[in-house]
């Protein structure tokens, strides 16, 4: 999987950009504020339909312009696709095209472009709330199980309906229609998450032994309620509590994927550098699992490669990325910070005030 060409129009300070990328490593070098992270953000947006920096997409559109447009040429296993996304300022409309055809969804783009993002802010995967770790698992299931996305969407829709109904009813029988289907979906999604977490665990632990040999990293999945309890029974038994609180307390929406180091929560005992290495290990293990199981490679996006890592650890990460045979985009302030990451096939772009050159 690789993006061979990217055309950008009106995306932050990138007014008009047309770039051809290496299928291996691509280095984006420039001072803070030069536009290198914006370029990384545009690639992420093309694959996710959202930004990793801003929750308000219309703010990404260049000032006084009506829209931004991203167009990419995608290559995978001798096949090529043309993909495009336009975000309009008026009404915030998003238009998606694949091979020139309208009517596609953002999820169609996401399926075509499996990406792993590594940023300094990405430590929330480890020291943030459980929602970040559920998203980590669900990303994998989205790419491994074709019917996961529809089941996950239906589950979230039913939870919203149930929570709204809790505000209006005093009789549990009014919720039974939702709870029968909700229980089925909850068990299915939780089973998929459990199986995926267990399949991923050996690869995570193996990568952690390489990156953090001084630590014993343990991985465990918690589905969001007692695994020995039927979820339908739990919903009925907890009706009064859920009604009092105003939302459904237990369930797959409370699941967590937890990590310990030498028996203690990693967020309590690891340094920021160790947390970053663990986060990198998780992303790499997940990408490698996709390759092994589905013969599909990820695109890795790495912002501020040198942050929190010493030269030795940067070398370890660089070598593991080279072994993955993935397309990699890396930002850095100076080329010197990338000296450990100099594979045979690479391309370096200089970024200065929204202007990009080889």
UniProtKB/Swiss-Prot annotation:
Gene Ontology terms for molecular function: ATP binding; single-stranded DNA binding
Alphabetical keyword list: ATP-binding, Cytoplasm, DNA damage, DNA repair, DNA replication, DNA-binding, Nucleotide-binding, SOS response
One GO term describing the cellular component: cytoplasm
Binding of ATP, residues: 30-37
Keyword Ion transport attached: no
Biological processes annotated in GO: DNA replication; DNA synthesis involved in DNA repair; double-strand break repair; SOS response
UniProt keyword annotation of Coiled coil present: no
Subcellular location: Cytoplasm
Pfam families associated with the record: SMC_N
Record function comment: The RecF protein is involved in DNA metabolism; it is required for DNA replication and normal SOS inducibility. RecF binds preferentially to single-stranded, linear DNA. It also seems to bind ATP.
Assigned protein family: Belongs to the RecF family.
Listed name of the protein: DNA replication and repair protein RecF
Gene name of the encoded protein: recF
